[in-house]
């Protein structure tokens, strides 16, 4: 249900010609399908453990590989693959992940690691949506700053054209997450 609200809101408000928007939507659907498959195994098949960790990791790896492939294939500038420390001049520290083809490996680890981090926090209180809302709120700012040249220059972020549209995607995650929390209070 959650991915539907995010998708509809994103499709209504985001620039649909932006590659990041479509890749983000694909990512949320791929990982949402993995979660659905796990819940299906738990509820319908009455298997309390759901999918095995190995199977989940395999599905996550396939989804991450597809996302990384799309990001790498549509790379438009050197800043798309630049690793930086925020608020530090790129001249002082920056590393182009295209060197030795590290970008696909790094992006894969970030995507799968982030997915599993959310799953690990879910076991703590049953509502993984709270950290998702908080992180998405921060990502609204980072994606906007990175995507707008005026702000990226002043705050020492590399400018990535089109990244500002991801702030809309992240805002839809925050909105859907807050709606989910409100729904669960009753």
Features from the language model and the residues they span:
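Alpha-helical transmembrane segments and their helix-start/interface "positive-inside/aromatic belt" motifs
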Residues: 51-63, 125-131
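Alpha-helical transmembrane segments
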Residues: 3-33, 67-69, 73, 78-83, ...
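Membrane interface segments of multi-pass transport proteins and intramembrane proteases
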Residues: 42-52, 86-95
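Membrane-interfacial loop-to-helix junctions in multi-pass inner-membrane proteins
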Residues: 17-25, 44-59
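Alpha-helical architecture
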Residues: 36-37, 54, 58, 120, ...
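Alpha-helical transmembrane segments within multi-pass membrane transporters and channels
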Residues: 31-41, 45
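Active-site His/Glu-centered metal-binding helix of metallohydrolases
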Residues: 37, 41, 62, 124
């Amino acid at each position: 249900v959650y991915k539907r609200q995010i998708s509809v809101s994103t499709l209504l408000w985001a620039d649909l010609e932006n590659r990041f928007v479509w890749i983000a939507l694909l990512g949320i659907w791929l990982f949402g399908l993995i979660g659905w498959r796990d819940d299906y195994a738990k509820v319908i098949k009455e298997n309390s453990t759901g999918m095995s960790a190995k199977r989940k990791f395999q599905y996550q790896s396939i989804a991450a590989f597809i996302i990384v492939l799309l990001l790498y294939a549509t790379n438009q500038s050197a800043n798309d693959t630049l690793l930086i420390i925020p608020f530090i001049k790129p001249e002082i520290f920056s590393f182009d992940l295209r060197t030795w083809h590290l970008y696909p490996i790094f992006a894969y680890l970030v995507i799968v690691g982030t997915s599993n981090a959310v799953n690990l926090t879910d076991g703590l209180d049953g509502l993984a949506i709270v950290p998702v809302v908080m992180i998405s709120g921060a990502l609204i700012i980072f994606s906007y700053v990175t995507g707008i040249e005026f702000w990226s220059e002043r705050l020492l972020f590399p400018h990535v054209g089109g990244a500002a549209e991801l702030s809309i995607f992240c805002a839809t995650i925050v909105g859907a997450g807050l709606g989910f929390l409100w729904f669960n209070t009753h």
